[in-house]
Design a protein with these regions (language model features):
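Mid-length scaffold segments of soluble, non-membrane domains
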Residues: 43-116
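Secretory/extracellular carbohydrate-interaction modules
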Residues: 1-76
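Cysteine/selenocysteine-centered motifs that mediate thiol-based redox chemistry or coordinate metal-sulfur cofactors
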Residues: 150-158
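Short, solvent-exposed loop/turn motifs
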Residues: 12, 124-125
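Flexible glycine-rich active-site/ligand-binding loops centered on an Asp-His dyad
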Residues: 126-151
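Short polybasic amphipathic segments
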Residues: 4-6, 115-118
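Short strand-turn-strand beta-turns centered on an Asx-Gly dipeptide
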Residues: 120-122
Length: 158
């Protein structure tokens, strides 16, 4: 269950879309994308506007498997120089990951001026003012060649 709205950095965000990521016929997590009321999901990503991506997990997942999947996707989406610049922050972000249990919620928030925050079960676990990090990490789900084109299409549908 995802809330229909979320308050972030003095912006009222509305849930634009939600979808489920399925891998080998098993539901892995549900995802919900939030953006400002007056913007479409695609506008929020392309501009970029304040946004939130929330994941609700159905399965146990080892944190190192999550990190590996993130790196595979980031390496597909970005050149080596970009990843080299972002690596210290990516490593710090990944260091906050915990082994995932069913019912866990991870949320990534982006707000202009405050950058990226990662929440784990409602608590801020990581924060960075770097908009390039926010763009790259949210891009794992919201940019082309990400984890799942089907999930991305569902989350960004108008």
């Amino acid at each position: 269950n995802f809330a229909t709205t979320h308050e972030l950095a003095q912006n009222n965000l509305e849930r634009k879309n939600q979808s489920v990521l399925t891998y080998l016929w098993a539901d892995v997590y549900a995802a919900a994308f939030y953006a400002p009321t007056k913007a479409s999901a695609r506008q929020a990503v392309s501009t970029p506007l304040t946004q939130r991506l929330e994941l609700y997990y159905f399965r146990n997942i080892d944190s190192q498997d999550v990190v590996k999947a993130a790196w595979v996707t980031l390496e597909r989406q970005h050149d080596a120089a970009t990843l080299q610049r972002l690596r210290p922050e990516l490593d710090a972000l990944h260091a906050t990951f915990k082994d995932i249990q069913p019912g866990d919620r991870y949320a990534q928030n982006f707000a202009a001026g405050s950058g990226l925050t990662l929440e784990i079960n409602g608590n801020v676990a990581y924060s960075s003012p770097n908009p390039a990090l926010a763009r790259a990490y949210l891009g794992i789900w919201l940019s082309p060649d990400g984890l799942s084109d089907e999930l991305r299409t569902s989350l960004l549908a108008d």
